[in-house]
Structures are given as structure tokens and as C-alpha cells.
């Protein structure tokens, strides 16, 4: 990013790269992680859950998190702002974010849930994560709170 002065950009768009590349870009621009910094609009190509976790664990709040389906794939369009409030989200919060707030949320949730059986194979039985995933797979209420 080529921004010379703080406040020069009110909104920054990061799209079409992985979640990890997105947060690495944010880390290289520390002025983004400051109160009053710009709003970030992100469309990660992969690992939506990981980006949500990173944002929350680094003091960002999701202002919006809208699921969009394009070319047979689901994407999450996220808007985040730095608040400084660090939080540790659950796996379920990271998986769905705030997507349930939108009409497309049910389709996105079904897509995310469809990936869980394979993911669950790599999670040791008896762990908190395993229990959380098992609840989601058993059809317990998940992100429709």
C-alpha cells in the first residue's frame, strides 16, 4: 500500500488473495491497526474462518460480513474496523462470522458445514474443538442465533 499520511485513505480494499496474505498485508501497514484507522473491506479467496479469527484476535471488529456466491463458490465480503478490543472467538463464530444476518446466510452456512466432516478427521476426539464440530454436524443450532 502506498499511503503517505495517516488518514489519507478512509477505506482500503483487499480482495482476491488468501486470508493469510490479507493479514500479512495488514501487518505491513501498522497505521491500519490504530484507532480511527481506515475501514478494511476484504474478500478473501480462501480461509474465511481464519481471517475472521485473526481480525478478532488483533483488535478488529466486523462491521459487516456478507456471504456472496459467484462462479459456484461462496465468498465472504467482510468490512472491519480497528477498535483495539481483542477477543478470542469460538470455532463456530469464526466459521460463520456475521453471515446469518443476510438472506444468503443459510446457503453459506450449508457450504461451510459441508466441509466439516473432512476437517473433523484431523481433530483429536475429546477436545473442545471436536465437541464444537460434532455439535455442528449433529444439526444443533449453529449460527442462526
Q: Model regions: which residues?
A:
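Class I S-adenosyl-L-methionine
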Residues: 8-14, 20-145
Amino acid at each position: 500500500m502506498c499511503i503517505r499520511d495517516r488518514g489519507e485513505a478512509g477505506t482500503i480494499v483487499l480482495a482476491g488473495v488468501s486470508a493469510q496474505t490479507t493479514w500479512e498485508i495488514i501487518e505491513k501497514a501498522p497505521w491500519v491497526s490504530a484507532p480511527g484507522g481506515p475501514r478494511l473491506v476484504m474478500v478473501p479467496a480462501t480461509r474465511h474462518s481464519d481471517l475472521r479469527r485473526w481480525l478478532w484476535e488483533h483488535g478488529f471488529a466486523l462491521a459487516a460480513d456478507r456471504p456472496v456466491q459467484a462462479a459456484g463458490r461462496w465468498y465472504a465480503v467482510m468490512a472491519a474496523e480497528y477498535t483495539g478490543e481483542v477477543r478470542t472467538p469460538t470455532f463456530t463464530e469464526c466459521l460463520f462470522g456475521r453471515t446469518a444476518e443476510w438472506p444468503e446466510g443459510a446457503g453459506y452456512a450449508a457450504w461451510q458445514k459441508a466441509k466439516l466432516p473432512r476437517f473433523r478427521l484431523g481433530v483429536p476426539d475429546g477436545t473442545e474443538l471436536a465437541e464444537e464440530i460434532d455439535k455442528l454436524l449433529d444439526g444443533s443450532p449453529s449460527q442462526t442465533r
